[in-house]
Each structure stands twice: as C-alpha cells, then as structure tokens.
C-alpha cells in the first residue's frame, strides 16, 4: 500500500533512520512523502529539531484516507501488538524498499516490510508482513522470514533458512543453510546458528573476553 502520505509509527533511533530512507524512496517515487511521526511520547524528537514532527499519539491516531504506516519498531512483539491495534482501526501499512536494496525478480515482499539500504533478498526469498531487514543484511535463496520478525544490521540468512513469526535476530548473526527457527525465538548478536532453534528459545555465542588490559 503506497498511500498519499506516509506516517512513521515510533519516534526512536530507528525512526530517525527511516525518515532519511523514506525520503530517498519518496525521491525515487516509490513511497509517499512522510507527513510525520506518531508516538505516545510527544517529546520523543525534542532533541532533534527539524527532523520531523510528532503529529499525534498511537493511542489517538485514526487513519485518514490514503494514509500508509511504516513501523519504526524493532521488537517483534511490540510490532505485532501495534499492527493488531492499528489494523483494527482500518490502518494500512506501507512497504519500504530502499533504492539501494537488491531484490531478485522472484523475491516476495509483503506489506509493511522495511528493506533498509544495501539489504538483499535473493531468488525466491520471502519476506513476510511487517518484517524489518536492516542495513547490509541478506535473505538467501528460498529463505523465508515470518511476519513481524526483525533482522538487525549485517545479518546473513543463507539458502532455505526458515524463520517463524516474531523472531529477533541480533546484529552480525549468521544462520546456515536449511536451519529452521521457531516463532518468537531470539538469536543473539554475532551468533552462528548450525541447528534448528525451537520456538521461544534464545541462542547466542560466547561474548568477547578480555585477554590483556593495557
């Protein structure tokens, strides 16, 4: 859904990134201009004058004809809750594909998805509803990312990987070919996942250790 005006949901750091990338998309003619941000904290952008206006709260927002929403939310459960809440009022969701993102002709991208700069969705990759694919992350051939999931920056999902709904993948994580990750799982930053991950599980790699202090 392209809409006549784009409204960003959430006013945190990711929103400030999305404002820039949405402007790139508007310049390319693939997204309506951003009218503002809705956030329950009216002062969320007070320290960033000139970035955008908070035009109302999520609680008070009522869709107007031609509105299309973009989610500036990383937490999958928060995304799901907001989508359910806003959809019940008749809201529709925009799809943001940055001009520098690379999509195979056979890739499938659902409404509400956000594909950030230099992201990749390869042959027959499937990015579900309201999924975030952050900068420099890749979805390999025949891989599937379930609705409301978030791929942080520099994530590598290889061929035939299947992520369930509401999965959170930390920055720099890698998932090897054919692995299945259940709904609501969390993959920690920098992890390399070789085996299937059950629904609701959290997996991570050992953090860096101090070997020598100066």
Per-segment meaning from a language model:
Residues 19-21, 50, 81-85, 127, ...:
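Short amphipathic alpha-helical segments
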Residues 25-47:
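NAD(P)-binding Rossmann-fold cofactor-contacting core
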Residues 96-211:
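Structural signal for interior beta-strand "rungs" in well-ordered beta-sheet cores
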Residues 22-27, 86-88:
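Short, solvent-exposed amphipathic alpha-helical segments in soluble enzyme
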